[in-house]
Amino acid sequence: MSQISAKDVKNLRDITGAGMMDCKKALDETGGDMQQAIDYLRKKGAALAAKRADRDAREGMVEIKMTADHKAGIILELNCETDFVARGEDFTNFTVALGELALAKCISSPEALMTLTLGEAYGGETVDDAIKTMTGKLGEKISLKRLVYIDAGDGVVESYVHPGAQLGAIIHLATDQPDAVRELARDLAMQVAAAAPIVVDRSFVPADYIAKEAEIYRQQALEQGKKEAFVDKIVLGRLEKYYQDVVLSEQFFIKDSTVKVSDVLNEFRKKHQVKVDVIGFVRCKLGE
């Protein structure tokens, strides 16, 4: 068995929120394997949350740019150290410039954007050099955390950025009537930003992951003293709740909590005689 260090225990506590003794025991029981220790704590009900809140979130800005015909778009996150700098004109303008460049050149990763050249406003420097220059000018570390480019083809992209530019989402719909679905697409982008789904529908959730979650729920129920005869029903109920949390089509619609997103899509198709499906989306929350 590997030696369990105090640092390992602290790291596990930071990840799970569980007590020090629970973390020590989990690592002992799993031979020091961090992922197995996390699963162990979840099964025992000792983990307080699957992920931490935004305590370690950096400051910065989420930027979204789309082409005029809404056939393509980008979403990016640029980080700095303080809210003061994030709200400043220099940082804001620089973020916008990066978004415009990424969209114009169809760039889909931070690494690819770094090699491109900015315009005269930034001395014709590469993005990499311009970030270094901006770091010196503002006196804070500036870093491009993420960047995603979406090409909708014959479909449409739409977006939503929450006031303050710390949260945004961009969504891709396949449709035979792009102009007709723009308002719906924006509502769905807002849904993604607010409700934080992970996948479009159940088919995107790996079967092995669901099996693992089901086993965790089963062990939790047994640890709570639930009777074996009721455990399967409890597991199914918790899986349904999980789907409602992470699957876009099964979430309740933010504009009408009596219907699900799937219902909204079906009703829209019937009412407007239009083909429309959600292909994908990207949600970006500062610091996550």
From Swiss-Prot:
Molecular function in Gene Ontology: translation elongation factor activity
GO CC aspect terms: cytoplasm
Q: Which SUPFAM superfamilies does this one have?
A: Elongation factor Ts (EF-Ts), dimerisation domain, UBA-like
Q: Please give the name of this protein.
A: Elongation factor Ts
Sorted alphabetically, the keyword list is: Cytoplasm, Elongation factor, Protein biosynthesis
Species: Pelodictyon phaeoclathratiforme (strain DSM 5477 / BU-1)
Q: What does this protein do?
A: Associates with the EF-Tu.GDP complex and induces the exchange of GDP to GTP. It remains bound to the aminoacyl-tRNA.EF-Tu.GTP complex up to the GTP hydrolysis stage on the ribosome.
Q: Where does this one sit in the cell?
A: Cytoplasm
List every stretch annotated Involved in Mg(2+) ion dislocation from EF-Tu: 82-85
Entry annotated with the keyword Protein biosynthesis: yes
The family classification in the record reads: Belongs to the EF-Ts family.
Say where the protein is mainly found. cytoplasm
PROSITE patterns tied to this protein: EF_TS_1, EF_TS_2
